[in-house]
């Protein structure tokens, strides 16, 4: 009887370990911030300002884009067969109401998280899904970037529903690549964060916390 009980407990333990599989992407520390790759958008007047803060849930990243555009990127391998879901906690304090985000003149978002798959020798050949916190579009709206067909904007949150409050969202990246790019991606090559207002010439303020991939 003791052997049976032990086997049951062991099976439950294995199940809980499997269900808890996670891969943390950003720690949001000062040291990490200094090491992340900063990419200024070509033609932007200034860089987005990124700073580290802390609340009851741990460290977070604050982004202030005032007629500015630059992103923070990390090259990291993510096994999408193992952990296909991206989880993001974020907040928009100042949004970009009134712009047309799916046009070249209005292609700005208060908060974005890119997931990137290398598909060629140069960055221009990469495929990306740009998960965005929109100020004007609806959740689950998606469209190819007006600047490149290889990046698709996908709305996970909108200030029409959640403004100036923390919200946590989840997306199945593996399935989204199949749906949006017609690609069966087994491994990602990088993740990036950006807040940008270089097209609208406006100001946006956003926050990021607890960005990780999970098995479910």
Regions found by a protein language model. Name each.
Residues 6-13:
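Bacterial N-terminal signal peptides
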Residues 20-43:
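Extracellular carbohydrate-recognition regions
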Residues 28, 191, 209-213:
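Extracellular beta-strand elements of beta-rich domains used
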Residues 50-71:
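Short carbohydrate-recognition loop motifs
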Residues 75-86, 160-163, 184:
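Extracellular/lumenal carbohydrate-interaction signature centered on repeated Trp-anchored short motifs
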Residues 89-95, 118-120, 174:
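Solvent-exposed strand-to-loop "edge" motifs in beta-rich extracellular domains
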Residues 106-151:
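Extracellular/luminal beta-rich ligand-recognition
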Residues 108-113, 149-150, 156-159, 163-203:
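Extracellular beta-strand ligand-recognition surfaces/modules
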